[in-house]
Amino acid sequence: MDQRKSVGMLSKGFLYRQRLGYGLGDFACNLIWQIISLYLLYFYTDVVHLGAKSIAVMFMICRVIDAITDVLVGFAIDKTKTRWGKSRPWFLFGAVPFAVAAFLAFSVPDISPDGKLLYAYATYIFLSFMYTVVNIPLASILPTLTDDMNERTVLATWRKFLAFLGSSIVSATALTLVQVTGRGNEALGFRIVMGMFGIVGCVCFFLTFFLVRENNLQENIKSATLKEMIMSLGKNTPWKVFAINIMFMWTGYFLQSSALV
């Protein structure tokens, strides 16, 4: 039986709820990850007093690990079969660990410098993995929400707008909230703010889970195996060029960031 539902068969109320729910997923991602992008390097170097070069190397290593986990999570989503669909469960079960990982990244204990660096490695790798867990499904779920190309464009627009809104909220309020809540103690302030944004992010991910529906599922299409996926990447010249470009981009970014600290 064909599970696809045309936009005309769905109520306007459902369409708007689904658009909002889909957008809230990226709102949550950016509300949490934007703090990481903007302030984690500063937190590690100026608040926790870790070496900028050590942190730059750590970020580079994590980017390499990310390249692997992105493929693995995508493969796992493709193999997921639940009554909620393939992608939706990842929002439900990934939300809290992602928020907790972000909180832990800003909760470096007062131990030796080597211990702090080891803690930073462990928490940042965990955080990056959990970001992959909740972010990759935002891309994989879109084709299953509708088979109407115009509606997919509308959904993508809602996603980008709410992602921008989440990033803007962080850029406009985070440092002020850190000063207010920490009362001069930046370490405490970052923990409190990350906890606040993490809670809001969790609620948004849960709303994404409850408001969207995977209807356009095609179970009869043969999925590639993990080995086939990896082999295809090795033969994909544009992908290899893109990967090298991304590596140089991140290297330049972190070298520049290190020089500014």
Residue ranges and their predicted role:
Residues 2-261:
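Membrane-embedded alpha-helical bundles of multi-pass transporters/translocases
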